[in-house]
Amino acid sequence: MPRGMMQRDSRKVSEEMKPTENPRVKICCIQSVEEAWMAIEHGAAAVGLVSAMPSGPGPIPEDLIAEIAAKVPPGVSSFLLTCLQDADAIVDQQRRLRVNTIQICDRLPAGSYQQLREALPGVSLVQVIHVTGPESVDEAIAIAAEVDAILLDSGNQSLAIKELGGTGRTHDWRLSRAIREAIDVPLFLAGGLKPENVAEAIREVRPFGVDVCSGLRIEGLLDPQKLAAFFRATDETQTNTD
């Protein structure tokens, strides 16, 4: 996924943002340079690098995030997953780590996106919407104009210890499809995806991209067999998407 593909300044309601039979694949919770290259060699368009989170799997130290991001080749997006809600803190984090995409896992105060745009030109912004009910559709519609893409996940921000991703749970894909049909930016689908269900998810939602973490891991490590099976399953949808 070329870095500029999702940049808002050139965004249009175009075919590359429409439902796709060949969704991009983002492999998240990358733990090492070796895992990043394994994902890329299998066809990943993006790798996800998880910074400190209140809960969930996958966080790695910032120095390791920076090391991996520096070795991601051109044409592949390096996503920084952040739970920070202060725009200045997010800017500082990106400047330390030099990723080309920021995945914002929690809600931001009003005006934050403009601050990020001004401070980080050329860096793509992806907002996570945790699909908990019909209200998530309205939330996604309201935010879509501010960002380069929306990513749907299955966390819960209302808990005492927030869940901001990595739950391994699916959510209601009918709501995901409703969101995809209502917005004009690319939509990534996450939440409980694995080789056994990703083809069904793609057929149901028809997202721009799919995102997976725990569904490809054994004892926390990226499993090459599961990884290969996931890509085979996504490939199957190219001729079977309705």
Located regions from the model:
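Conserved N-terminal beta1-alpha1 strand-loop-helix module at the mouth
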Residues: 2-209, 214-239
